[in-house]
Protein backbone atom coordinates (compact mmCIF):
# COMPACT_ATOMS: atom_id res chain seq x y z
CA UNK A 1 0.00 0.00 0.00
CA UNK A 2 1.31 3.43 -0.93
CA UNK A 3 2.02 6.02 1.74
CA UNK A 4 -0.17 9.13 1.82
CA UNK A 5 1.85 12.27 1.14
CA UNK A 6 1.36 16.03 1.41
CA UNK A 7 3.39 18.37 -0.80
CA UNK A 8 4.45 21.61 0.94
CA UNK A 9 4.93 24.40 0.00
CA UNK A 10 3.27 23.49 -3.29
CA UNK A 11 4.43 25.55 -6.28
CA UNK A 12 5.32 25.13 -9.95
CA UNK A 13 8.78 23.77 -9.07
CA UNK A 14 7.31 20.51 -7.76
CA UNK A 15 4.48 20.23 -10.29
CA UNK A 16 6.07 17.10 -11.80
CA UNK A 17 5.07 15.20 -8.67
CA UNK A 18 1.42 15.96 -9.37
CA UNK A 19 1.50 15.64 -13.15
CA UNK A 20 3.17 12.23 -12.91
CA UNK A 21 1.81 11.04 -9.58
CA UNK A 22 0.78 7.66 -11.00
CA UNK A 23 4.50 6.91 -11.52
CA UNK A 24 5.45 7.43 -7.87
CA UNK A 25 6.66 4.14 -6.42
CA UNK A 26 5.58 4.38 -2.80
CA UNK A 27 3.51 7.53 -2.41
CA UNK A 28 0.00 8.74 -3.12
CA UNK A 29 -0.42 12.52 -3.21
CA UNK A 30 -3.41 13.30 -1.00
CA UNK A 31 -2.96 17.06 -0.66
CA UNK A 32 -1.01 20.06 -1.91
CA UNK A 33 -0.62 22.80 0.69
CA UNK A 34 0.63 26.33 0.01
CA UNK A 35 1.14 29.36 2.25
CA UNK A 36 -1.57 32.01 1.96
CA UNK A 37 0.84 34.42 0.25
CA UNK A 38 1.15 32.14 -2.78
CA UNK A 39 -2.41 32.93 -3.86
CA UNK A 40 -3.13 29.33 -4.85
CA UNK A 41 -5.66 28.31 -2.21
CA UNK A 42 -8.84 26.76 -3.56
CA UNK A 43 -7.40 26.35 -7.06
CA UNK A 44 -6.61 23.10 -8.83
CA UNK A 45 -2.96 22.04 -8.53
CA UNK A 46 -2.62 22.54 -12.29
CA UNK A 47 -3.11 26.29 -11.84
CA UNK A 48 0.50 26.58 -10.67
CA UNK A 49 1.82 25.46 -14.06
CA UNK A 50 -1.04 26.15 -16.47
CA UNK A 51 -2.00 22.55 -17.21
CA UNK A 52 -5.17 20.49 -17.28
CA UNK A 53 -7.06 20.05 -14.01
CA UNK A 54 -5.77 17.28 -11.77
CA UNK A 55 -8.64 17.02 -9.31
CA UNK A 56 -6.32 18.00 -6.44
CA UNK A 57 -7.35 21.31 -4.87
CA UNK A 58 -4.59 23.37 -3.27
CA UNK A 59 -5.25 23.84 0.42
CA UNK A 60 -4.15 26.24 3.14
CA UNK A 61 -5.28 23.88 5.91
CA UNK A 62 -3.02 23.02 8.80
CA UNK A 63 -1.36 19.76 7.88
CA UNK A 64 -2.49 18.38 11.24
CA UNK A 65 -6.05 18.44 9.83
CA UNK A 66 -5.10 16.11 6.95
CA UNK A 67 -4.68 12.33 7.04
CA UNK A 68 -1.17 11.60 5.72
CA UNK A 69 2.01 9.63 6.37
CA UNK A 70 4.84 11.70 4.86
CA UNK A 71 5.40 15.43 4.39
CA UNK A 72 7.21 16.09 1.09
CA UNK A 73 8.97 19.44 1.41
CA UNK A 74 9.70 20.91 -2.01
CA UNK A 75 12.08 23.68 -3.00
CA UNK A 76 10.66 27.20 -2.90
CA UNK A 77 11.50 30.83 -2.23
CA UNK A 78 9.82 30.65 1.19
CA UNK A 79 12.01 31.41 4.19
CA UNK A 80 13.13 28.21 5.89
CA UNK A 81 12.73 29.37 9.48
CA UNK A 82 9.46 31.25 8.94
CA UNK A 83 7.57 28.84 6.69
CA UNK A 84 9.31 25.46 6.44
CA UNK A 85 10.41 24.58 9.97
CA UNK A 86 7.01 25.26 11.59
CA UNK A 87 5.48 22.68 9.22
CA UNK A 88 8.32 20.23 9.89
CA UNK A 89 7.71 20.57 13.63
CA UNK A 90 3.97 20.13 13.17
CA UNK A 91 4.46 17.02 11.03
CA UNK A 92 6.84 15.55 13.62
CA UNK A 93 4.38 16.28 16.43
CA UNK A 94 1.74 14.40 14.43
CA UNK A 95 4.08 11.41 14.14
CA UNK A 96 4.69 11.88 10.41
CA UNK A 97 7.93 11.49 8.46
CA UNK A 98 9.53 14.44 6.69
CA UNK A 99 11.22 14.16 3.29
CA UNK A 100 13.07 17.14 1.81
CA UNK A 101 13.04 16.96 -1.98
CA UNK A 102 16.05 19.26 -2.32
CA UNK A 103 19.38 19.86 -0.65
CA UNK A 104 19.38 22.08 2.43
CA UNK A 105 22.23 23.54 4.46
CA UNK A 106 23.95 21.50 7.15
CA UNK A 107 22.49 23.75 9.83
CA UNK A 108 18.98 23.38 8.44
CA UNK A 109 19.44 19.62 8.13
CA UNK A 110 20.65 19.37 11.72
CA UNK A 111 17.68 21.36 13.01
CA UNK A 112 15.16 19.29 11.03
CA UNK A 113 16.75 15.97 12.01
CA UNK A 114 16.86 16.88 15.71
CA UNK A 115 13.22 17.97 15.59
CA UNK A 116 12.15 14.68 14.03
CA UNK A 117 14.36 12.56 16.28
CA UNK A 118 12.64 13.95 19.37
CA UNK A 119 9.34 12.60 18.04
CA UNK A 120 10.81 9.31 16.75
CA UNK A 121 10.00 10.03 13.11
CA UNK A 122 12.25 10.00 10.06
CA UNK A 123 13.81 13.02 8.40
CA UNK A 124 15.23 12.33 4.93
CA UNK A 125 17.03 14.80 2.67
CA UNK A 126 17.17 13.73 -0.98
CA UNK A 127 20.27 15.06 -2.74
CA UNK A 128 22.37 14.43 -5.81
CA UNK A 129 24.54 11.34 -5.27
CA UNK A 130 27.97 12.03 -3.78
CA UNK A 131 30.81 9.76 -4.87
CA UNK A 132 34.57 9.49 -4.49
CA UNK A 133 35.59 10.12 -8.09
CA UNK A 134 39.25 9.24 -7.38
CA UNK A 135 38.22 5.57 -7.33
CA UNK A 136 36.54 5.83 -10.71
CA UNK A 137 39.42 6.90 -12.90
CA UNK A 138 40.29 3.73 -14.74
CA UNK A 139 40.18 5.84 -17.91
CA UNK A 140 38.75 3.09 -20.00
CA UNK A 141 35.56 3.70 -21.91
CA UNK A 142 33.06 0.96 -21.23
CA UNK A 143 31.40 -0.29 -24.43
CA UNK A 144 27.64 0.18 -24.40
CA UNK A 145 25.45 -2.44 -26.02
CA UNK A 146 22.15 -0.61 -25.51
CA UNK A 147 20.67 2.62 -26.90
CA UNK A 148 21.24 5.78 -24.84
CA UNK A 149 18.73 8.63 -24.84
CA UNK A 150 19.62 12.11 -23.59
CA UNK A 151 17.07 14.77 -22.66
CA UNK A 152 18.61 18.24 -22.78
CA UNK A 153 17.67 21.87 -23.35
CA UNK A 154 19.47 25.17 -23.89
CA UNK A 155 17.30 27.08 -21.39
CA UNK A 156 15.53 26.41 -18.09
CA UNK A 157 11.82 25.76 -17.49
CA UNK A 158 11.29 23.50 -20.50
CA UNK A 159 9.80 20.59 -18.53
CA UNK A 160 12.80 18.32 -19.08
CA UNK A 161 11.91 16.19 -16.08
CA UNK A 162 8.40 15.59 -17.38
CA UNK A 163 9.90 14.46 -20.69
CA UNK A 164 12.21 12.08 -18.81
CA UNK A 165 9.27 10.61 -16.92
CA UNK A 166 7.19 10.38 -20.08
CA UNK A 167 9.94 8.46 -21.86
CA UNK A 168 10.37 6.17 -18.87
CA UNK A 169 6.66 5.38 -18.79
CA UNK A 170 6.47 4.77 -22.55
CA UNK A 171 9.51 2.48 -22.68
CA UNK A 172 8.44 0.47 -19.65
CA UNK A 173 4.96 0.01 -21.11
CA UNK A 174 6.64 -1.27 -24.29
CA UNK A 175 8.41 -3.92 -22.22
CA UNK A 176 11.89 -2.39 -22.04
CA UNK A 177 14.13 -2.50 -18.99
CA UNK A 178 15.01 1.14 -18.30
CA UNK A 179 18.17 2.26 -16.49
CA UNK A 180 17.84 5.97 -15.82
CA UNK A 181 19.54 8.99 -14.30
CA UNK A 182 17.33 12.04 -13.79
CA UNK A 183 17.81 15.75 -13.23
CA UNK A 184 15.82 16.15 -10.00
CA UNK A 185 17.03 15.32 -6.51
CA UNK A 186 13.79 13.45 -5.86
CA UNK A 187 14.17 10.96 -8.74
CA UNK A 188 14.25 8.16 -6.16
CA UNK A 189 10.55 8.71 -5.50
CA UNK A 190 10.00 7.54 -9.08
CA UNK A 191 12.41 4.60 -8.83
CA UNK A 192 15.59 5.89 -10.48
CA UNK A 193 18.76 7.78 -9.57
CA UNK A 194 19.49 11.50 -9.42
CA UNK A 195 22.40 12.80 -11.48
CA UNK A 196 25.68 12.49 -9.50
CA UNK A 197 26.98 15.62 -7.82
CA UNK A 198 30.33 15.45 -9.65
CA UNK A 199 28.58 16.31 -12.92
CA UNK A 200 28.25 19.86 -11.58
CA UNK A 201 31.83 20.05 -10.26
CA UNK A 202 34.28 22.54 -11.74
CA UNK A 203 37.39 20.55 -10.77
CA UNK A 204 36.63 17.75 -13.25
CA UNK A 205 37.11 18.04 -16.99
CA UNK A 206 34.20 17.19 -19.25
CA UNK A 207 36.07 14.08 -20.40
CA UNK A 208 36.58 12.91 -16.81
CA UNK A 209 32.90 13.49 -16.06
CA UNK A 210 31.98 11.18 -18.93
CA UNK A 211 34.28 8.43 -17.65
CA UNK A 212 32.95 8.77 -14.10
CA UNK A 213 29.35 8.77 -15.28
CA UNK A 214 29.91 5.55 -17.23
CA UNK A 215 31.23 3.80 -14.12
CA UNK A 216 28.47 5.06 -11.82
CA UNK A 217 25.51 4.55 -14.14
CA UNK A 218 23.03 1.96 -12.83
CA UNK A 219 22.84 -1.25 -14.84
Question: Model segments located where?
Answer:
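Conserved small/polar residues in nucleotide/adenosyl-binding loops
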Residues: 215-219
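Short beta-strand-centered segment that lines the nucleotide-binding/catalytic pocket of NTP-utilizing
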Residues: 175-188
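Long, basic/Gly/Ser/Thr-rich N-terminal segments
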Residues: 1-120
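P-loop NTPase switch/communication element
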Residues: 186-205
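Flexible loop/N-cap segments at domain edges
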Residues: 211
